[in-house]
Each structure stands twice: as C-alpha cells, then as structure tokens.
Design a protein with these regions (language model features):
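Ligand-binding pockets and gating/stacking loops
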Residues: 1-394
Length: 394
C-alpha cells in the first residue's frame, strides 16, 4: 500500500476522539466482538474472523523510497542514514534463496504493478539472481522473438554453457556462478512454458474474471493467486496508481496528486476492500489459504491529527505506529494484536517490529531464523537482527 495508509482511517479508528483526530469516516462493527473498523471496509468487516489486525507496528526509521526497513526487516537499512541500504536483501529475496519456487519453471519471487523500481527492495548482498521478477514485463519477456525457435534456443543455451565454463575457470569472484544460476533459471522459465501459462490471466473462467473485476489491483491480485497456485513462493503487489511516492500518501487536497482523507483515501478503500477479501476468499475456496500468507501493509502510519502542511483534510507521515492486516498461512486468525494510544499516535501495547514480521514470514516459509548471509567484506549478517514470530497467531 505504497505511500502509507492512515491507521486511524482504516483498521484503528478513534470514534470517541474529536473530529480533527477521528477524521471524516464513521466506523462499523465486525465479526469480532467489540472490534470496529472504517465504514468503507464492509467486506473485510464481515469476514474479519479470517484476518488478524495488528495495531501496534513499530515503523520507526521507515521511509517512502526506497522502503527498505519494512521490506528487509532491518532498521539499519534506513536509506536516510545508511548509504548501503540497498544492499540489505528483501524478505522476498531471502525466501527465493532459502526456499526457492514451489514448482520448476516458475520465478520464486515476483513483483506486480511495479510503478517504480525504487519502491521495491531487491537481492542486495544475496546477488542479482535473487532480485524479483518483474511480472509486468512477463508477456514480452516469456515469449521467443520472431524467428527464434525452441530448438535454436536450446542450441544457443548449449553454446553459452560451454563459454561460461571457460570463463568460470578464470573467475575468482564468484560472479560467474551467480550469473550461471541466473541464466539457468531464466532458461527454465522461458523454455518450460509453465510461467507463460501462469501469467496469462485470460485463461481464467469468465465467472472468476467477473468476480475479481477489471480494476488493475484486482487483476494483479488474480495474477498473484495464479502464480502462487502454480509455484511462486513470494509475490508482492505494489498497490499504487502513481509512479512516485505512492497513492496512499494522503497529505491533503492541496498537495497533489494524492488528495486528503476524504477525496484521496475514501475512493481507494472500497477497491482495496474488494481486492483483499476476494483474494482471501478465492484462496480459501481453492484450499490454498492455509498454505498462503496474505499481508497488506504500507511503510508507516499517518499523523493522529488532520491538517498537516497547511492542509485541513490530510495527514502527514508518521513513522511511529502503523496498522496492518494478515490472513492465511495456517495461523490462528480472528484477533487484534497490540493497541495504539487514545489518539492513535503511539504504541500503547505489544510493539510489533519489522523483525517480528519477517520472522513470522520466515517461520511460515521454513527459512531458518538463525540464518545468515555474507556482506561484501565476507562478514556474516543475520537474516533477522531482532525479531520473533508472532506468538499470538502460532
């Protein structure tokens, strides 16, 4: 949810506070007794027993671009203070290395709706072979150029492997090994045909296409389901309509292009509500939800008081506390973890760190929590500096 959705105007409303805090939205009850959320999330409210809300995510040091802290689970990856922030591998890249794809011929880590590469953390110290596959380019990337047959492709591959062996004999940096791994995976993806089929959403029945709808986010969610169903192990959808900063960056109507809470955030919420609930329901009906962890989150929260940067209807960045939701993954859902203060501006109970979120994902994916990778100086770096799987849902 690129840009940082407001915690107060989504999953952590403050209906008893003055309007300048509670905002313009009403709240509605949910399937969980005593739990209320924003009025523009009615579908999620009706099936909140399948979700876990986290209202106490510690998002200090997080920023827009690149959003490294939340995507790498390492506070040292703050680009504002660390020029090497880009070298910390993303959670998806770690999963790609330690878990790989669930089926051959499918990229393990895919990014969809990639409006700006700077939004997404990559392989870093793990190497470019663990960068995410740009799913937006799949249609052109997975088809052979005109005049190139599959037999000819196999001949070229054989020749390249002979040349690679000669170069590897004189290579001492390890770069050739990484390149060979990367090219081998690329060849398997192109030659196998499974990826072409997975990325072709038009193969879905009309009823399924209609169920998801025509909005870009909905089609990306459907594509994500197809990829998971066919073997991808980590898929990220950038829920943004803009190439810079992010759609959820609702500073105010006088600060384009995102608008404030009423004109900017309000139109997004019904779309998001439909997308997240349709995806979770579809995964559940197909028997995939218990194996698939679905997470919706931004990079930080927003100010507890309306009227920032000269606006009367927006909220500024607030890298102190944020809310998020998750579903699936054979975890125990139907609960709220943590709490914010009365005005939604700080953590009151059970701080959840980026490391805790990463540890929960790694626990789900079978990645060793005590694992390490090596930096460019040959020093071991822990996959998680500090963090444990969320005990409440395990």
């Amino acid at each position: 949810m690129t840009g940082g959705p407001s915690q107060i105007d989504t999953w952590d409303p403050k209906p008893d506070m003055p309007r300048e805090v509670r905002g313009p939205f009403a709240t509605i009850p949910t399937r969980l007794p005593g739990v209320r959320i924003c009025e523009y999330l009615p579908k999620q409210a009706r099936m909140l027993d399948k979700f876990t809300l986290i209202r106490s995510v510690d998002c200090r040091f997080s920023s827009h671009e690149p959003n490294m802290v939340m995507q790498t689970a390492n506070v040292a990856a703050d680009p504002g203070t660390n020029p090497k922030a880009r070298m910390y591998p993303s959670i998806g890249s770690v999963v790609a290395k330690h878990h790989g794809a669930n089926k051959p011929g499918i990229p393990p880590y895919v990014v969809l709706n990639l409006k700006s590469r700077s939004h997404i953390a990559e392989g870093g110290y793990l190497g470019p072979q663990f960068n995410p596959f740009n799913g937006d380019l799949a249609r052109q990337a997975l088809h052979l150029p005109s005049g190139l047959t599959m037999d000819r492709l196999h001949e070229r591959r054989s020749l390249f492997r002979q040349m690679d062996k000669l170069r590897a004999d004189i290579d001492h940096s390890g770069m050739m090994a990484a390149t060979d791994t990367f090219s081998q995976r690329a060849f398997e993806i192109i030659a196998g045909g499974a990826a072409q089929e997975a990325f072709d959403v038009s193969r879905e029945p009309v009823a399924v296409l209609d169920r998801y709808g025509t909005h870009d986010w909905a089609r990306q969610a459907l594509l994500a389901r197809r990829l998971v169903e066919r073997g991808s192990s980590f898929v990220t959808i950038d829920l943004s309509n803009h190439s810079n900063s992010g759609t959820w960056d609702t500073h105010g109507d006088n600060i384009p292009p995102y608008g404030g809470i009423w004109n900017g955030l309000r139109p997004l919420l019904p779309v998001f509500d439909h997308v997240i609930t349709t995806l979770v329901s579809d995964l559940d009906e197909r028997g995939l939800l218990k194996d698939t962890l679905v997470i919706a989150m931004g990079e930080f929260g927003r100010t507890p008081t309306l009227g920032t940067q000269g606006s009367t209807d927006g909220r500024n960045h607030w890298p102190i506390v944020m809310s998020m939701c998750m579903a699936g993954g054979a975890f125990r859902h139907g609960q709220v973890i943590g709490a914010s203060t009365r005005d939604g501006g700080d953590i009151a109970e059970r701080a959840v760190t980026p490391g805790d979120l990463a540890a929960t994902i790694y626990h789900h994916m079978g990645v060793p929590l005590d694992g390490t990778y090596t930096d460019h100086q040959g020093r071991p770096v822990p996959l998680i500096e500090r963090g444990e799987p969320l005990r409440e849902i395990i």
